[in-house]
Amino acid sequence: MKHLEPRATWVYLREHPNALFVDLRMEIEHLYVGHPPGVVHIPWYEYPEMQVDPARFAAQVEREAGGKTRPVVLLCRSGRRTLPAGAALEAAGFGEVVNVVHGFEGELDAHFRRGRLNGWRFDGLPWEQM
């Protein structure tokens, strides 16, 4: 698995227009916190069950990607959920998986707030919300 910070991910996506960009956060995060334009929403788990099913996730990504050879870029809130999700895709046979380090909102600062240290939005990259 490759690990790219948000700005490097933006460059990667422009250089790999065929890459599947997946937001694996819960639907409420995706819709109301915001997301990059064009990202495909495939949750790693969903409320209220909160059950991780790596086989289901890999099958959904494979269906959306049209196979396992297309590069897959994974985004979550802070870059933590993408690690086990990326490992699941690699175990399922995906050839190129990219983890967006720091995710969409970034790491917590000293006051337990996100979006002040790093992350997709912090870096000023394109995003939208409902």
Task: Give the residues covered by each predicted segment.
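Conserved G/P- and acidic residue-centered "switch" motifs that form tight phosphate/ATP-binding loops
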Residues: 79
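Rhodanese-like catalytic fold shared by cysteine-dependent sulfurtransferases
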Residues: 1-20, 27-71, 82-130
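Short, surface-exposed ligand- or partner-binding patches at beta-edge/loop junctions that are enriched
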Residues: 74-75
